[in-house]
């Protein structure tokens, strides 16, 4: 089975988030209630169907993964206490003390069932083929206390895949229908009340002792409430007033929250903003000379400030922090800003100015249909207008097309009625991008921009044959090859503000480090 493009793109754009959290001011106090704002309802709570970041934030309270990741990008134990890795498989030895929220032990068979349910074509899981690689199988040995994940051929990040699997245990293994509105996991908290559109309440499991190394649930809050607050201004007001303990802010309310007394904060990278050129044979951007000229026409530093409303950072790669492969794949690999050189390059490519200033070649105008999501905020809208002006200055005719997410996915997957698209991406492993940046083109495949970069594919093929650490140089070079060919243009690393009042907590890749949640002294 191949993941449908629309679902896969949703996963790329919405699933991942970076590391973040807030430091404590003063001591901490056990018990009490920690209240955190979610910007939307998490929807169906079955881990196999969780594609939204808010869903996975919610699930992270109640479920564990096989392994975790620390702030430096290193894999650390979770349900698995140790592992052995081969090019095409990894065998995990599970802890013996982990139990499910209903008291049942967590077994290798539970892990295997979680994986094989995701990979079952009948499940139609949107994370299969993106977070869980196509072809993965799981086999349990309950007597030995091990579970083996295998692939039909070598796969670099087979160990790292273990951090993407929320393990269902206990009653949820036998009856997955209960997972739509309840939880059945081994996490530090269990769901006790779900009021869709309003709040989700979790109670601590004091017996929890199998979290990240060196952590404890002893002083954790008795209750965690995730409150649905769609409006950021409202969420900011609630935090400042003390009605909330934690929020994540994307927009202009960040400034006043940062300045509010008693608020601790962390700036966290959560996604990359970039645009892609459609390389179909009938498109002007099929020609690499045109793509590079259009890129040269843009002051990317200025565009980054516009798109992020001044809160972004320079991009250094496609994978979110903490990265399994450390390095800057962007600097020195993107065509530099030079409008005069851009105009000259278009002249050389045969695109000559017409009577109205729009360039023409073989009777065809240099028209670019620019597609972007209207749900990404005012900065992305302003960025679209900036690009239209910059490209208009060198003789391109730009038609802006703002669309909601579902329409954008339809355009990418089916109608292909675009020439340039602004598409945020958030992935935790470089392998999660391969199907979207190479291979069969849409609508038959997931390669929505019709990319055909032989250097990228060759480097990916080499990197995929060896474990992640050995292949990192090749993975990094593969990203740079995309930028050098102007297949896609990285613009900005988008950030959010993680803010807390009366509490402290940590998040990694959009998921709670549950044993880090604490109420500070004096909190209610």
What are these regions (language model features)?
Residues 84, 89, 127-172, 193-195:
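Surface-exposed binding/hinge segments that line
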Residues 162-219, 223, 339, 344:
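Gly/Pro-rich hinge or "lid" segments in bacterial periplasmic/extracellular proteins
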Residues 28-29, 195-198, 298-329, 378-388, ...:
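Detector for C-terminal structural segments
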Residues 208-257, 385, 397:
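Ligand-site clamp/hinge motif
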Residues 81-124, 145-148, 284-286:
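Aromatic- and charge-enriched surface segment that lines or borders ligand/interaction sites
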Residues 352-427:
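Ligand/substrate-recognition segments at binding pockets and active sites
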């Amino acid at each position: 089975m191949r993941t449908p493009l629309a679902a896969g793109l949703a996963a790329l754009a919405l699933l991942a988030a970076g590391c973040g959290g807030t430091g404590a001011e003063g001591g901490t106090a056990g018990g009490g209630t920690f209240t955190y704002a979610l910007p939307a309802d998490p929807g169906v709570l079955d881990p196999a169907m969780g594609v939204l970041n808010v869903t996975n934030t919610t699930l992270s309270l109640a479920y564990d993964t096989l392994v975790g990741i620390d702030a430096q990008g290193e894999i650390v134990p979770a349900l698995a206490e140790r592992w052995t890795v081969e090019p095409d498989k990894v065998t995990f030895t599970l802890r013996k003390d982990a139990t499910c929220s209903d008291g049942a032990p967590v077994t290798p068979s539970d892990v295997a069932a979680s994986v094989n349910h995701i990979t079952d074509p009948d499940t139609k899981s949107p994370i299969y083929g993106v977070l869980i690689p196509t072809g993965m199988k799981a086999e349990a040995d309950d007597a030995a206390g091990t579970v083996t994940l295998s692939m039909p051929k070598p796969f670099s990040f087979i160990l790292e895949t273990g951090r993407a699997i929320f393990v269902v245990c206990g009653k949820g293994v036998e009856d997955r229908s209960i997972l739509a509105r309840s939880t059945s996991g081994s996490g530090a908290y269990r769901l006790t009340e779900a009021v869709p559109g309003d709040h989700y309440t979790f109670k601590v499991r004091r017996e929890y002792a199998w979290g990240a190394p060196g952590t404890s649930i002893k002083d954790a809050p008795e209750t965690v409430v995730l409150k649905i607050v769609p409006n950021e201004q409202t969420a900011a007001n609630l935090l400042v007033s003390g009605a909330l303990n934690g929020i994540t802010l994307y927009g202009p309310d960040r400034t006043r929250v940062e300045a509010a007394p008693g608020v601790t904060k962390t700036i966290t990278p959560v996604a990359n903003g970039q645009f892609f050129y459609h390389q179909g044979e009938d498109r002007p951007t099929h020609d690499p000379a045109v793509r590079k000229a259009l890129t040269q026409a843009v002051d990317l530093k200025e565009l980054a400030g516009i798109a992020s409303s001044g809160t972004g950072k320079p991009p250094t790669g496609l994978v979110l922090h903490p990265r399994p492969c450390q390095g800057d794949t962007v600097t020195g690999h993107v065509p530099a800003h030079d409008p005069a050189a851009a105009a000259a390059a278009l002249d050389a490519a045969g695109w000559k100015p017409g009577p109205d200033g729009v360039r023409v070649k073989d009777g065809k105008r240099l028209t670019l249909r620019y597609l972007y999501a209207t749900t990404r905020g005012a900065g992305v809208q302003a960025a679209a207008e900036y690009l239209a002006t910059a490209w208009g200055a060198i003789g391109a005719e730009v038609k802006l097309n703002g669309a909601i997410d579902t329409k954008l996915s339809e355009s990418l997957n089916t109608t292909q009625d675009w020439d340039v698209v602004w598409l945020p991406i958030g992935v935790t492993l470089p392998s999660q991008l391969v199907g979207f940046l190479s291979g069969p083109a849409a609508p038959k495949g997931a390669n929505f921009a019709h990319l055909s970069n032989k250097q990228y594919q060759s480097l990916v093929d080499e990197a995929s044959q060896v474990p992640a650490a050995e292949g990192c140089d090749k993975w990094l070079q593969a990203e740079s090859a995309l930028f050098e060919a102007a297949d896609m243009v990285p613009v900005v690393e988008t950030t959010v503000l993680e803010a807390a009042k009366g509490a402290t907590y940590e998040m990694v890749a959009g998921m709670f480090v549950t044993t880090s949640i604490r109420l500070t002294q004096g909190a209610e």
